[in-house]
Amino acid sequence: MKQITNIYILVDTSFRNERNKEKLQTILNKYSRALNFEKGKAKLHIIGYNDKAKILHPFKRITTNGNPNLSEGLKLLESVIKYQRKYDEKQTRSVFILHGSDNVLQGWNAPLERLFDLKEFAFGLRYVVQYGNHDKYAKQAFSRFTESNDKILPYFSENRLTSLLSSIRRVV
């Protein structure tokens, strides 16, 4: 059985991120294109969050509305991880990329702590791609998500993702 690397991407689809909508669409297309080279060794899971969270398709147009409610995205991420655990027996280290805007609503603490109870999230590689100048709540949320300020990045390129996936393959 093949070993699968799961890539989970959380995208802020609130009104606050309207100005980055086209950039996000391009980035999601590039992520999907990067995974085409993996040919069944990696799965891409894209979760958009605002007042409600939903699964996104990389080639369908992103619509923005609502507030940047990160807790909704984290709850759906927890459900997706548990679902993947049932069906992917041979998993490698997971990759989590959070594309956040400059604002986050409060209430993200409890869902994030529940995620740290899942081994896929606790031992996964976690990055934040942040747009704009973040407020103190966004800074706290992003720092806690990555557990390291050096993983809060201004961008995350297609090349970085492919090299990260190949390094995971070499370790496993």
Segments the model singles out, each with a brief description of its role:
Residues 60, 114, 133-172:
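Von Willebrand factor A/integrin I-like adhesion domains
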Residues 18, 38, 50-82, 86, ...:
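Short, charged loop segments at secondary-structure junctions
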Residues 46, 126-128, 150-154:
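Conserved beta-strand scaffold positions in the cores of enzyme catalytic domains, especially
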Residues 2-57, 77-80, 93-100:
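Von Willebrand factor
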Residues 27-30, 72-80, 110-111, 163, ...:
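Well-ordered alpha-helical segments embedded in enzymatic catalytic cores
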Residues 65-67, 103-148:
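VWA/integrin I-like adhesion module and closely mimicked acidic/polar interface patches used
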Residues 35-38, 88-89, 116-124:
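Arginine/glycine-rich "motif VI" loop of SF2 helicases in the C-terminal RecA-like domain
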Residues 65, 91-92:
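A contiguous binding-surface segment within folded domains or other stable secondary-structure elements
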